[in-house]
C-alpha cells in the first residue's frame, strides 16, 4: 500500500471506520465559520456593553488597537479528526470549535498490546531530556500491561549516557541497551529522541537503517521542517508519527511516577500522523501517548507542531519569561526595592502564585484576586507590554515558519565543536548574574510550600505576554488545544515549577538542546523591548489602552482554558531542589 501523507486541512466530520483499514487519518476539508475571537470586533451585546463601560473612564485605545479589533484571523484553527479501533475518541468544544481527544489513564494500559500490534521492539534513540523519561514510562507501562514488547535504548558507542541508561535498568545483557544503528535496524517502532541538530545531520543514515514498513516516532516536528527547507521528505516505505509531550522530559517522568497510585498522571501530549503505510499509525501513536501517561492527547499535524513548539519555547515557555523577570528585577531594584523583595515580586510571583492560579482557575482569576489599586497597576502593565511582546513574538513565529530559526539551531549545534580553525562554543551559563545569586538566598529562607506574593505589575506584564502569544498562534491558524497547551498549560504546570525550585537554568537546561538554544537567543530580545518600550511608556504616563483591557476580559480563550483545566494532570508536579529525575549535570542538593 502506498504511503498516505496527512493533510493540514481542517475536519470536523467523523467518517465511519473503513472495513479495509482499522485506522484512518481523516483530512476532509470543511469550511469553518469564524466566530468573533480574541481581539476581533463582536456583535455580542454583552461585549459591547463591557467595552463601553470600561472605555468610559477617559483613556483611549491606539490606532494599532483599532486595526487589531477590526481585523480577522488569517485562517481558521486547524481541527483534525482521526479514527482509532483501540481507544475511545471524545469530542470537546473549545471556544466554539470542535476538537477530538483521547483521555489517558493507567486503566487503559491493558489496551497497549492491541495498539502496538505487530511491534516486537521499540527502539528509543537518545538519552537527553525526553529519552530517559519516555523509555522508562514505556517500559513500566508495558510491564503493567503484561506485554513482551522490548523497549531498547540505542546510543552512540562510547557515549557517557550508557552508564545513565544502565542505572535506569537498561542493560546489554538483557537486550535493552545497545548501539544506535543496531537498535534502529532491529526495531519496529523507532523513537528518535536525539537532539534536533543531530537529527538534521544524521537523518539519511537513520532512514537507511530502518526496516521497510517500520514506524518512525518523533517527539518534535523539527526534522520535517529541516527536510522541507531542503525540498525533501521522509522515505515512502515507513510510517511517520509524532507524540509530543507538552513539557520537558523530567516532568514527563516525574508526573508519571507521582500518579502511579491514582490512575495515572503525566503531561498532556499532541499526536500527529504524517505518513501511514499500513493503517496502524494512529493507534500506535495513541498507544505511545497513553503509555507515557498523558492525561489527554489531542491531534495536530507535524508542521503545526514544530511551528508552535519551537515558537512557544522561545516565547512564554522559556525565553520570554526569562526576559521578563530580568527586565522587571532590574526596574524594581533601580526604583529602590530590596533585591530579595524584587526577586520575590518577579520570579517567585510568576512561578508560584500566578502559575498556580492560572493552572487551576485561569488568567481572569489573577486579575480578579487583586485589589482595586492592584487592578489599575495590572492594567497599566498589561496595556504597555502587550504590543511590544507581540512584536517580538510575531518576528519569532515567522522566523520559525520560514525555516530561519531551524537553520539557526542546526548551525549552532555545529559550533559546539571545533571547526574551520575556530574554537568550540558550547552553551554558557545563564544563572550566574547578581539576580540569580539573590534567588539562591531567597530560596534558602523560603518556607516550605510558599508560593510567593502576587505583585500586580508583574502579573500584568506576564499575562499580556501570554495573551499576545495566544493571539499570534490563533492568527496563524493553530487549534485551541495546541494554543492553550503551548501558551498556558506547559508553562504553568510543567516548566515554571522548575524555575520556582532552583532558578532559570534549572528550568531551561532540563529541556531539549533546541529549547535551550532558543531561550538564550530570544530572552534578551524580550528584556530589551520591555525595557526600551513598555517600561518607558509606563514612566511617561501613556494612557491605558482600553480596547486591550476590554478584549482581555471577554476573550473566548478563557472558556477554552476552563475546559482544558478539567483535563489537567491529577496531581501537581513536585520538584524538590535535590531532584534526582533531572539531567545528571543539574543534580545537586543546594540552591
Swiss-Prot record:
Disordered: region residues: 1-20
Name of the molecule in the record: Ketol-acid reductoisomerase, chloroplastic
PTM sites of type N-acetylthreonine: 53
Family: Belongs to the ketol-acid reductoisomerase family.
Molecular function as annotated in GO: copper ion binding; ketol-acid reductoisomerase activity
Subcellular location as annotated: Plastid, Chloroplast
Domain KARI N-terminal Rossmann: 102-300
Gene3D superfamilies hit by this protein: N-(1-d-carboxylethyl)-l-norvaline Dehydrogenase, domain 2 (1.10.1040.10), NAD(P)-binding Rossmann-like Domain (3.40.50.720)
GO cellular component: apoplast; chloroplast; chloroplast envelope; chloroplast stroma; cytosol; mitochondrion; plant-type cell wall; plastid
Catalytic reactions on record: (2R)-2,3-dihydroxy-3-methylbutanoate + NADP(+) = (2S)-2-acetolactate + NADPH + H(+); (2R,3R)-2,3-dihydroxy-3-methylpentanoate + NADP(+) = (S)-2-ethyl-2-hydroxy-3-oxobutanoate + NADPH + H(+)
Annotated positions binding Mg(2+) 2: 309, 486, 490
Cross-referenced InterPro entries: 6-PGluconate_DH-like_C_sf (IPR008927), 6PGD_dom2 (IPR013328), KARI (IPR013023), KARI_C (IPR000506), KARI_N (IPR013116), KetolA_reductoisomerase_plant (IPR016206), NAD(P)-bd_dom_sf (IPR036291)
EC numbers: 1.1.1.86
First and last residues of the transit peptide: 1-52
Pathway the protein contributes to: Amino-acid biosynthesis; L-isoleucine biosynthesis; L-isoleucine from 2-oxobutanoate: step 2/4; Amino-acid biosynthesis; L-valine biosynthesis; L-valine from pyruvate: step 2/4
Subunit-structure text: Homodimer.
Any one GO BP annotation for this protein: isoleucine biosynthetic process
Active site positions: 220
Cofactor: Mg(2+)
Amino acid at each position: 500500500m502506498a504511503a498516505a501523507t496527512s493533510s493540514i486541512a481542517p475536519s470536523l466530520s467523523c467518517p465511519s471506520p473503513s472495513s479495509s483499514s482499522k485506522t484512518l487519518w481523516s483530512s476532509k476539508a470543511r469550511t469553518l465559520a469564524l466566530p468573533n475571537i480574541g481581539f476581533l470586533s463582536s456583535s455580542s451585546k454583552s461585549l459591547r456593553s463591557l467595552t463601553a463601560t470600561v472605555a468610559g473612564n477617559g483613556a483611549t485605545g491606539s490606532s494599532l488597537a483599532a486595526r487589531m479589533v477590526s481585523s480577522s484571523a488569517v485562517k481558521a484553527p486547524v481541527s483534525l479528526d482521526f479514527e482509532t479501533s483501540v481507544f475511545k475518541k471524545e469530542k470537546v468544544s473549545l471556544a466554539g470549535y470542535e476538537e477530538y481527544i483521547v483521555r489517558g489513564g493507567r486503566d487503559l494500559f491493558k489496551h497497549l498490546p492491541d495498539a502496538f500490534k505487530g511491534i516486537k521492539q521499540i527502539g528509543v534513540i537518545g538519552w537527553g531530556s525526553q529519552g530517559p523519561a519516555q523509555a522508562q514510562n514505556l517500559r513500566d507501562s508495558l510491564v503493567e500491561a503484561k506485554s513482551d514488547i522490548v523497549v531498547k535504548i540505542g546510543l552512540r558507542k562510547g557515549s557517557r549516557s550508557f552508564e545513565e541508561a544502565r542505572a535506569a535498568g537498561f542493560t546489554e545483557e538483557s537486550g535493552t541497551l545497545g548501539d544506535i544503528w543496531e537498535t534502529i535496524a532491529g526495531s519496529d517502532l523507532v523513537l528518535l529522541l536525539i537532539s534536533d541538530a543531530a537529527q538534521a545531520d544524521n537523518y539519511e543514515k537513520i532512514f537507511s537503517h530502518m526496516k521497510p514498513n517500520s514506524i518512525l516516532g518523533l517527539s518534535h516536528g523539527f526534522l520535517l521542517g529541516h527536510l522541507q527547507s531542503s525540498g525533501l521528505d521522509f522515505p515512502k516505505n515507513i510510517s511517520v508519527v509524532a507524540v509530543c509531550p507538552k513539557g520537558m522530559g523530567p516532568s514527563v517522568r516525574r508526573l508519571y511516577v507521582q500518579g502511579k497510585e491514582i490512575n495515572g498522571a503525566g503531561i498532556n501530549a499532541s499526536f500527529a500522523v504524517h505518513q501511514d503505510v499500513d493503517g496502524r499509525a494512529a493507534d500506535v501513536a495513541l498507544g505511545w501517548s497513553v503509555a507515557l501517561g498523558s492525561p489527554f492527547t489531542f491531534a495536530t499535524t507535524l508542521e503545526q507542531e514544530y511551528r508552535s513548539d519551537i515558537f512557544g519555547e522561545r516565547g512564554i515557555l522559556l525565553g520570554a519569561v526569562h526576559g521578563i523577570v530580568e527586565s522587571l528585577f532590574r526596574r524594581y531594584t533601580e526604583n529602590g526595592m530590596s533585591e530579595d523583595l524584587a526577586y520575590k515580586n518577579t520570579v517567585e510571583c510568576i512561578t508560584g502564585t500566578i502559575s498556580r492560579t492560572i493552572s487551576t482557575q485561569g488568567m481572569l482569576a489573577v486579575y480578579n484576586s487583586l485589589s482595586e489599586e492592584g487592578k489599575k497597576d495590572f492594567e497599566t502593565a498589561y496595556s504597555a507590554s502587550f504590543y511590544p511582546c507581540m512584536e517580538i513574538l510575531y518576528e519569532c513565529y515567522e522566523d520559525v515558519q520560514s525555516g530561519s530559526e531551524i537553520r539557526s539551531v542546526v548551525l549552532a549545534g555545529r559550533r559546539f565543536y571545533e571547526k574551520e580553525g575556530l574554537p568550540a562554543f558550547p552553551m554558557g551559563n545563564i544563572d550566574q548574574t547578581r539576580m540569580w545569586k539573590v534567588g539562591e538566598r531567597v530560596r534558602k529562607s523560603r518556607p516550605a510550600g510558599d508560593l510567593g506574593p502576587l505583585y500586580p505589575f508583574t502579573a500584568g506584564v506576564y499575562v499580556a505576554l501570554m495573551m499576545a502569544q495566544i493571539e499570534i498562534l490563533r492568527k496563524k491558524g493553530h487549534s485551541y488545544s495546541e494554543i492553550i497547551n503551548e501558551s498556558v498549560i506547559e508553562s504553568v504546570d510543567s516548566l515554571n515549577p522548575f524555575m520556582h525550585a532552583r532558578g532559570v537554568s534549572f528550568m531551561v537546561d532540563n529541556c531539549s538542546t533546541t529549547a535551550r538554544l532558543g531561550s538564550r537567543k530570544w530572552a534578551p530580545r524580550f528584556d530589551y523591548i520591555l525595557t526600551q518600550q513598555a517600561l518607558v511608556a509606563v514612566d511617561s504616563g501613556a494612557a491605558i489602552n482600553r480596547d486591550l483591557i476590554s478584549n482581555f476580559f471577554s476573550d473566548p480563550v478563557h472558556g477554552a482554558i476552563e475546559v482544558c483545566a478539567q483535563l489537567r494532570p491529577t496531581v501537581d508536579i513536585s520538584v524538590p531542589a535535590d531532584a534526582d529525575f533531572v539531567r545528571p549535570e543539574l543534580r545537586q542538593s543546594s540552591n
